[in-house]
């Protein structure tokens, strides 16, 4: 038994020791497949390497017939609960994540008995075998800090949140100087909520009228937890309960809880850059435009990825060339175009990203001239309560 400097010095000392010992021991029976689902649900938070080696473990907390599993990298925490078949002894231990996952992946679905055998090891027993693994004291696991009493709370339809993240996350930046650009802005208003992402070359807004607040609020969610949320919110989830303060945010759905630190910083005034008076309007089939851009961009310069749009009444010609390799391509498409003849250049990967992440049949592109941002949005609203728009900066062309 290790002695701690923080041990009580009065008559409660014996109780402290007994409690410390009890919490380190546990025994339960659980479905191996259900346990695998549980650990995989939180495994994305396990760091590959950490300054705190304890974070390379799952924290198991057994209370009654519920096993709570926690994984964290100190910035992001995932927690879920699963029901066990029987509990012989409650407790809390930290178990090695990789070894636990590797073992469970190789087991067919069957009852699995987990029991501590000493103050540093536990046994996983199944019908035809067993495995002994080390564990670590739960008190070594860092305390997880959630939101405080100032937190703003709201409910977000699960599918709308997934769609909003999927529609914007690809436009986030990797900017060490402006960390706010590395996340998605949740701009919450009394009439709607808008998710915004930008890397300065393109800006994407996803607005839903299903989420409102009594007063305006906002937070910036880093792309990593945003991507994990998109991946782990299942189709059976109906609502995500969100709480956020000035430092942290939590997302609760079903038996899963996600806690993460927010990006600290001020997001640019994105509404100021959304074009309002672009009068040259192109209406075209999204899939056909996407496929044409992909074909033509094969012959673009691989360093610049420049492609050119030549817009005239009734037609759009897309062209690209790489003088260094003496290759070029162009393709003309029928379209509906109302406006002045216009030639404008773009980086093909940005166009491809935006078009690939819109689900509409037809889209509208609005231009002012060859030097200012173009606006891209669905020609028809896919749902009355949701809308998406993209803004892309042009490039100078010769």
Describe the function of each predicted region:
Residues 2-398:
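Structural preference for solvent-exposed beta-strand-turn elements
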